[in-house]
Regions:
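Glycine-rich beta-strand-centered segment in the early N-terminal region that forms part
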Residues: 22-40, 49-90
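NAD(P)H dinucleotide-binding glycine-rich loop of Rossmann-like/cofactor-binding domains
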Residues: 15, 88-150
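Short glycine/proline-centered loop/turn elements that form peptide/ligand docking sites
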Residues: 73-74, 172-181, 220-223, 245
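Mid-domain Rossmann-like dinucleotide-binding core that forms the NAD(H)/NADP(H) cofactor-binding site
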Residues: 122-195
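C-terminal capping/lid region of NAD(P)-dependent oxidoreductase domains
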Residues: 1, 287-297, 305-324
Length: 324
């Protein structure tokens, strides 16, 4: 089968190459998926660029969609021919979705309705499940107003839609060029984080009340809200990333005396019940008829280098997907 792989870290144009590899055979509890689309996420390009790996080569990408071609032992044969989307395809595995086929545990191939195309479904795994779990966590808090950072990102765009559908007043951060995208997704206001002080603008937009929660993609930047009245007492920060992965100082006094809650999660490591709940929310969201998946580029498999470069540039206004 045709596969995209890298055997060392580096620039996309220097390390990505196509190779022919044996078609996988589904093992006990697995399904073999003939892939139609492979989603390219920021975590995929970061892994290729510089994260150590334990294999002699890696076939990248965790998200994808296609059709089940075969099943291994202890999997219902009725699944053959089923349209599915795949999550965690390459998490702690050698073979991801940048290939013509992938064998994964049956639970990692989720049923896909006929109404949803493969390119859209290839955006569900990391962006969709991250957003769904974040909003599930939000649902456990008393929240009327929520700040969504990176609201024009693939994850943030889903979060804005889901939270606004739940009746929350959503304030998003985004560049001026992407503000309309965030407003169309359901945000009441957009803060240009490049030109405006986020904390001060929150207070202005809420008449000094602040927000009850933050769903955050970059704790390095957002941590300063811990000590700001822009985040109300008894507020919650739900965080799934940070541009600085080192030590980030926060004022314990403010955490304590404001009775703040910090919730962090990695979408790859959700507990089984958390994953199931996220899949359920994402499915309901997609069936609502209101869901919007913003796809910036759909490229042929042969243009994988360009896809990685687009994601790395930050200039893609939406998801980047490869047709396999």
């Amino acid at each position: 089968m045709k596969t995209l792989l890298y055997s060392r870290n580096g620039r996309a144009d220097a390390v990505l190459e196509f190779r022919d590899k044996p078609k996988p055979v589904p093992q006990d509890g697995e399904v073999l998926v003939k892939l139609e689309a492979s989603g390219v996420n920021p975590s995929d390009v970061k892994s290729r660029a510089g994260r150590p790996f334990a294999f002699d080569f890696v076939v990248p990408h965790s998200d994808g969609a296609g059709i089940i071609e075969a099943v291994g032992p202890n999997v219902d044969g009725a699944r053959v021919g089923e349209r599915v989307w795949v999550w965690n395809g390459q998490w702690q595995r050698q073979y991801g979705t940048a290939a013509e086929f992938i064998a994964v545990p049956s639970a990692q191939a989720v049923h896909l309705d006929d109404a949803v195309d493969f390119e859209t479904a290839a955006c569900f795994g990391i962006p969709g499940l991250t957003a769904a779990h974040a909003v599930n966590l939000l649902a456990t808090t008393k929240c009327e107003r929520v700040l969504v950072t990176g609201a024009a990102s693939s994850v943030g765009h889903y979060v804005v839609q889901m939270a606004s559908m739940e009746g929350k007043q959503v304030i998003g951060t985004a560049s001026e060029a992407k503000a309309d995208t965030v407003l169309e997704a359901g945000a009441s206001s957009v803060i240009d984080y490049r030109k405006e002080d986020v904390g001060e603008k929150i207070l202005e937009l809420t008449d000094g009340a602040g927000v009850d929660a933050v769903i955050d993609m970059d704790f390095y930047s957002t941590s300063r809200l811990v000590s700001s009245s822009a985040l109300r007492s008894h507020g919650t920060i739900i965080c799934y990333g940070s541009n600085d992965m080192g030590e980030i100082p926060v004022a314990f006094r403010d955490l304590l005396f404001k009775s703040l809650t910090l919730k962090f999660f990695l979408v790859y490591e959700l507990l089984e019940h958390e994953r199931s709940a996220a899949v359920e929310r994402l499915g309901a969201f997609m069936q609502s008829g209101k869901a919007k998946t913003r796809i910036s580029h759909v490229l042929p498999f042969e243009e994988a280098v360009k896809a990685h470069e687009l994601v790395e540039s930050g200039n893609a206004n939406g998801n980047v997907v490869l047709k396999v």
